[in-house]
Amino acid sequence: MPTINQLIRHGRKRLKKKSKSPALENNPQKRGVCVRVSTMTPKKPNSALRKIARVRLSNGTEVTAYIPGEGHNLQEHSVVLVRGGRVKDLPGVRYKIIRGALDAEGVANRRQSRSRYGAKKPKK
């Protein structure tokens, strides 16, 4: 415990809030190029093959990003837009690829929550 005199001299140090997506450097999204597109298995109670991409961002950092939705057209050298947001059952995946932006196409035949997957409104 500091004395009152010590507090007057130095004051309390504010704790800095640690960013959950440091590679974005306080930007809402960042552009990047896919280096590798592959699958990954989730943590213990779940079982699947989640689609992920290793992306080199425009600032030079390489991150692992999740590809949401069913089916995708991404391959090596695809240019994608990356946003923050982790996938709870994939360790080390703290970013998501935005569907419907740049080279990532929207999800086909998507009828609900379309805006999240870059899908156009279906014809009547």
From Swiss-Prot:
Annotated Gene Ontology cellular component terms: small ribosomal subunit
Region (Disordered): 11-30, 105-124
This protein's record includes keyword Ribonucleoprotein: yes
3-methylthioaspartic acid modifications at: 89
Intrachain S-S bonds: none
Any Pfam family hit: Ribosom_S12_S23
Example GO biological process: translation
Molecular function terms from GO: rRNA binding; structural constituent of ribosome; tRNA binding
The UniProt record lists the keyword RNA-binding: yes
CDD domains the record matches: Ribosomal_S12
Composition bias type Basic residues, residue spans: 11-20, 111-124
Protein keywords: Methylation, Ribonucleoprotein, Ribosomal protein, RNA-binding, rRNA-binding, tRNA-binding
Subunit relationships: Part of the 30S ribosomal subunit. Contacts proteins S8 and S17. May interact with IF1 in the 30S initiation complex.
Protein function: With S4 and S5 plays an important role in translational accuracy.
NCBIfam families xrefs: rpsL_bact (TIGR00981)
Assigned protein family: Belongs to the universal ribosomal protein uS12 family.
Protein name (record): Small ribosomal subunit protein uS12
Protein source organism: Kosmotoga olearia (strain ATCC BAA-1733 / DSM 21960 / TBF 19.5.1)
Lineage of origin: Bacteria, Thermotogati, Thermotogota, Thermotogae, Kosmotogales
Gene that specifies this protein: rpsL
